[in-house]
Amino acid sequence: MQQQFFNFTWNGLKVLGAVLFGVISGLRADVYDDAQEIAGYFYTLNADKANPHKKINHTKGFCANGEFIPNKEVVKNFDIPILQNKSKVKVRFSLAGGDTRQSDKSKNRSLALKMQGKNEGWEMAMTNARINFATNANEFKQFMRLQVQQKEGKITQDSANKQKAKTRSFANFAKEIQSLPITPSFANAAYHSVHTFGFKQASGDFLLARFSFVPKSGVKGLSSEELEGLGDDFLESAFKKAVAKSPIEFDFTLIVPNKNDKVKDTALVWEGQRQEIVLGTLKVNKFDGYGCNSEVFMPSNLPQGVEAPNDDIFELRSLVYAITSSKRQ
C-alpha cells in the first residue's frame, strides 16, 4: 500500500513538474495559472488547519476492491489492450466537499477507479451527474468564486443562485443535480465520465464516446419517508451490508454521440436515445477500509488505445488534481 501511495503521488508531482518546466506539448501558461487559482479556491472552501494534509475535495469516502471482467464479444472490436483481460480494480466511493462529517443525505455520489492491467493502468474520476458545471476555465473560476463569496458572507445563497442562473452551464448543472435521486447506497447510483474520450477500434479508427458505470441493480432513490428514518451516515454501512451478500456490479458502458451532439460541451446532457456499448462488468466484492483516501485518482492517466478528451476543461481539471495533491504531501 505504501509503495502504491508513493507511485500515484509521484505521478501527480510529475504532472506538476512537467507543467512548471513547460514540457507538456501545447500547454499554455494561462492554463497552469487558472489551475493554481482554482486550487486556491478549493483550499479557501475546504482547508482544515488542524489537518493540512487531508484530501481537499471528496474528503469523505472509503475504499473497496474489485475486478473488471470484459465482454469478450465486444472488446475484440477495440484495440485497447487493458480491456482484453480481467483486471484488478481499486475503488473509492465518496461525497463531494471537504468535510468528513458531511451528511450522506446529499445528492452527490462519486466513484474513482484505478484499473490495473498487466502492463499499464487506467484511472477514472466520476460523479453521478452526467455533466460538469463548467465548459471552460472562466466558468470554472466564476463558479468557484461564487462558492467562496458565499462562504465568506459576501453574498447570500439566493444571490449566488440568481447569478448562476444567468450562465447556461451553471443552470444546466443545477437542473441536473435537481433531477438526481438521493440513493440509499453507492451501489444504486450511475457514474459518468462527463468528458468525451477516443476509443481505438480494431480498424484503427477512434470512436468518440462518453462512458458510464451503470448499476446492474438499477438506479434507485429514497422516498421522503425512508430518508427521514436515516441518520447522516448510512452509505458505508449500506455498502458493507450489500457487498457481504454478493458483489456489487456495474456495466462499463460507452455512450456514443449522435451526429449533431456537441462532444466538447461538458455542460450539455445528451438527451434521447444513443448507441450504448457495454465493454464489460465492474464487480466490486470487498470493503477495503480508508487507505486509498490519501491517494490521487488522476483521470489523465490513460491506457494505450484511449485518447484524452479534446475539450476546454479536461486538462485543467487534471492540473488541479496534481496541484492539490502536491500541496498535501
Model-derived regions: residue spans:
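Sec/Tat signal peptide C-region and signal peptidase I cleavage site
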Residues: 25-29
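Active-site-adjacent core segments of small-molecule enzymes
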Residues: 30-329
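A general boundary/transition motif marking the beginning of the first structured unit of a protein
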Residues: 1-4, 227
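Short, linear, compositionally biased motifs with a strong N-terminal bias
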Residues: 19-22
